[in-house]
A protein has these predicted regions:
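Conserved SAM-binding loop
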Residues: 1-111, 129, 198-201
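Short, hinge-like loop/turn segments at secondary-structure boundaries
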Residues: 47-50, 117-120, 157-161
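Residues that recognize and position ribonucleotide moieties
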Residues: 52, 121, 190
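A C-terminal cap/extension of S-adenosyl-L-methionine-dependent methyltransferases
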Residues: 64, 149-204
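Short glycine/proline- and charge-enriched loop/turn segments
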Residues: 107-114, 159-164
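Acceptor-substrate binding/catalytic loop of class I
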Residues: 112-131, 144-145
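A structural motif corresponding to the C-terminal end of an alpha-helix
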Residues: 134-137, 202
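Conserved S-adenosyl-L-methionine
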Residues: 137-148
Length: 204
């Protein structure tokens, strides 16, 4: 993971799917989760890694720390006061460190699935830029990602009213289609996507 230094913190680790991929790349990694039940599962899953700290954290928080960076995938859309949450992330990171975010894109794609999973919003680049700027962060990268994923998600959840589940088709998409999409989007940034990707620098 670029941008994050050697001692990052993940906000909203859930069951640790991303953390398991990232841990080998850092000398130290802190995984956090707000939900007590998921925190127990997270500790069971990551507890065997000596380089990992696992702790409960709910944003916004007044905690101040000096992590080398912060990463949060598909969490900010659950938080009502997302600007205060971003300010909290900034206080956890030392000056000059980066915050890496992925959030779901486009309000028109808000579906019963989003609502059922606790989403209070979906983002555009404009709304993400506004939130990051209001939080006092300097934007370094901001773009849409996974254009094909948005089309598939919208058709599945809003047109056909399906509930996406882990299964053979999802795994096949992740294994075969997603890598090709990522490679293509490195060359040409799409004007839309399933997610907004952002990298922002903490002042100082």
């Amino acid at each position: 993971m670029p941008f994050l230094g050697d001692n990052p913190i993940e906000i909203g680790s859930g069951l640790g799917d991303y953390a398991l991929e990232w841990v080998p790349h850092f000398s130290h990694f802190t995984a956090t989760e707000a939900d007590p039940g998921r925190l127990v599962a997270l500790k069971e899953r990551l507890g065997g890694h000596d380089s990992v700290d696992i702790r409960q954290m709910l944003l916004p928080t007044d905690e101040v720390n000096s992590y080398s960076g912060a990463v949060s995938y598909n969490v900010l859309e659950h938080i009502e006061d997302h600007v205060s949450a971003l300010r909290s992330m900034a206080r956890l990171v030392r000056p000059g460190g980066r915050i890496v975010l992925i959030v779901p894109a486009f309000p028109f794609a808000m579906s019963p699935v989003d609502i059922a999973t606790g989403h209070v919003r979906r983002y555009t680049k404009k709304s993400m830029r506004q939130a990051l700027t209001e939080a006092g962060l300097t934007i370094e990268r901001l773009h849409y990602a996974n254009a094909l994923g948005l089309i598939g998600y919208y058709l599945a959840t809003s047109v056909f009213r399906l509930t996406p589940k882990e299964g053979p088709m999802v795994k096949l998409y992740d294994r075969l289609v997603l890598p090709v999409t990522r490679a293509a989007e490195r060359l040409v940034r799409p004007p839309f996507g399933q997610s907004v990707f952002a990298v922002a620098r903490v002042s100082g």
